[in-house]
């Protein structure tokens, strides 16, 4: 039998070394050994330090977990007015000039950490973006930015895969993998793909949902945030402790390449 391959990492709570399946770390490989887990880039992040990158990686896991649970569970998002988000007025003006429609919704999780999903409707396809951040406004801005960034690519993809799109419109059960899912919310598709399980007509200002996502600000306070500054390691430790209170263990592997180490 072909030996299974493991990579050494660390438990974030204790710092103890642990063994991680290789495909969780080097997820773009085609290994010679039989895989028993599907590796993805979920949880991969960069930062100005290992601690900061770890914080962003954990937040991405929270984003993906919240998004998928809401999607599969059809858990309603809380519709939020994109125009009430600070710092995005110029981007929304550009979106309006293009004739696109934008929606934003707060997705809820057990930690009350802010996670937003945004949708851009170009008229031919809907592009989605999602983001988690400890700051409520920061999470909303990042979700909107991601959706806007994805929109041109989604338009090109739908045009290039027109035959596949028509087949999925006829029968969405034909969807086979993750590449098919972005082709479902298109013009002529089923109405259930048209919204974020929230009515845009009921959108509220972002400050109204602040109490439903206060977990992020609580973590910042416990980590000693002062004057907008916080030590990344303290933030990492508070985030890890918050997650592990629900019995979820967290691990990390430093993926930095040698040339990245040389660059600092």
Residue ranges and their predicted role:
Residues 1-264:
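Helix-biased "structured C-terminal domain" signature
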């Amino acid at each position: 039998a072909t030996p299974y391959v493991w990579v050494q990492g660390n438990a974030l709570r204790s710092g103890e070394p642990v063994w991680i399946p290789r495909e969780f770390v080097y997820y773009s490989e085609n290994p010679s050994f039989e895989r028993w887990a599907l590796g993805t880039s979920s949880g991969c992040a960069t930062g100005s330090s290992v601690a900061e990158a770890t914080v962003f990686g954990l937040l991405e896991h929270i984003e993906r977990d919240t998004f998928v649970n809401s999607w599969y569970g059809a858990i309603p998002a809380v519709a939020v007015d994109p125009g009430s988000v600070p710092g995005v007025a110029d981007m929304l003006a550009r979106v309006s000039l293009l004739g696109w429609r934008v929606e934003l919704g707060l997705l809820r999780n057990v930690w009350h950490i802010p996670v937003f999903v945004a949708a851009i409707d170009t008229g031919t396809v809907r592009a989605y973006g999602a983001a988690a951040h400890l700051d409520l406004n920061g999470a909303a801005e990042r979700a909107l930015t991601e959706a806007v960034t994805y929109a041109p690519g989604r338009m090109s993809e739908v045009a290039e895969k027109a035959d596949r799109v028509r087949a999925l419109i006829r029968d969405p059960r034909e969807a086979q993998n993750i590449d098919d899912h972005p082709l479902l919310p298109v013009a002529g598709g089923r109405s259930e793909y048209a919204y974020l399980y929230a009515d845009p007509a009921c959108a509220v200002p972002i400050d109204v949902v602040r109490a439903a996502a206060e977990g992020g600000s609580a973590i910042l306070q416990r980590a000693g945030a002062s004057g907008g500054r916080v030590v990344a390691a303290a933030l990492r430790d508070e985030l890890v402790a918050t997650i592990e209170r629900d019995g979820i263990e967290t691990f990390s592997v430093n993926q930095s390449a040698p040339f990245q180490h040389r660059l600092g």
